[in-house]
Amino acid sequence: MKGEPMTATRSQRRDCPDVSPICEVFKMLRRLMLWVGVLAGTAGSLATAQGLTPNASLAKMQLPEGLRADLLASEPWVRQPVAIDWDDRGRLWVLQYLQYPNPEGLRRIEVDRYSRTRYDRMPAPPPHGPRGSDRLTILHDDDGDGRIDRGHDFLDGLNLASGFAFGHGGVFVLNIPYLLFYPDRDRNDLPDSDPKVLLTGFGMQDAHSVANSLMFGPDGWLYGCQGSTVTSNIRGIEFQQGVWRYHPATDRFELFCEGGGNSWGLDFDAQGHLLYSTNYGGHLLLHGVQGGYYVKSFAKHGNLHNPYAFGYFDHAPHTNFTGGHVTVGGMVYQGDLLPESFRGKYIAADLLGHAAYWHQIQPLGSTFATRHGGNLLQSNDPWFAPSDLTIGPDGAITIADWHDARTAHPDPDASWDRSNGRIFRITTWQSPPRAAPFDLSLLTDMQLMDEILHPVSANAWKKRRSRQELVRRYGSLAGEKIEQTESFNALIERCRDAALRSDEPSGALEALWTWISLRHGRA
């Protein structure tokens, strides 16, 4: 579907006078037709967004000189996007959070003043629990013009699904209260089986604070954020907000650090420092260190869970705070498409300010301070609500737009416009419409190592995905136990040699991280 979705702006509608009882009947019928089409998820739904059309919303965006934004995808292929990422074949995946804010099939027992909800039971994991509306969709640009032509679901029927990550021959999915693994070892874009339940006990009291932002760290662990107004209890470890991690090959779970805020977004810089976002007013991010404890709104969220933590760290000091107080999808730009001045800058979306900003990260002793740098994208569309952003294979920045007049849910029974959502791509005016087709699985082990150790390439996406492809080939979740074969030994030897002999510190780090990931990735 290449043209604009069929929709109407406010000025184009022809509503009847509200005083007419007959009109009220027609309005109710029209609303019913809208929701029937939306809930069915059909591409041919005639009534869609209440706000601006995708192209009209695009026209409301302002970017720095030399940069441009293009519409990559919109309804009907994308609705309520909460997480996006590019796979090893250069295809964009989107997690559609259509069940938000109430889980399917559960009964509310109690809702407190902070919107924390107690339900009648814990649902069984998919496919045995209540079938929700969330879906994980693969988007396809068949003709290479930079616009999505079609989409198909890798998964549907999910119920409060808030994050996903590729790795180990499949897809990891947060379907609260579970962390699931869906194998797809034949790479046919269909799960090989029902999911394996890896972790149980993520809090589900508040759908806008649940666990989120899955991504693999350079050490081979799978990391995720935890929001503020939910309480998780994983294998006897209870916590509210913070960062947790899971090691797929050894089945270990750890609370990496506790505290911060309602965090939706984390990343690692070129040296491996973990930075995660916050909704704490006046601040941008936290520098997460293993075993660290950070400030919380203690009256609202409770004390730190370690009784021997007699103090805590604060957020990174921030200068020239701008916009709303909710930072989402924060990442360190480590691409080679945007101008060099953006490299190493922290780029994050401002959910309430309808914008995305870039910020300077400055060393401050053993940690960092941040300073607002400027706008990456500012929208004058009040429905533009950036919910996630990521770097693509070509170094472009991809931004998901939740696209709604509001995002919070103080009233759990309020109606929501689930008919729309957009994804935009930020590039330069000289950039091609899309990355050239590729498939990392077709590269040899040594070609993947070339990508990881490339001294010139500044695209962290290629390095990270190449490392994950090697782990897929030799990790314990990729099939039978891998013995020390000649090819595996050759990889380890190259990692060791690069770590010891590299003239570039970044090359030595990349080699060390790959060595650790491969060694821990084996059963």
Predicted feature residues:
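Bacterial N-terminal signal peptides
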Residues: 29-45
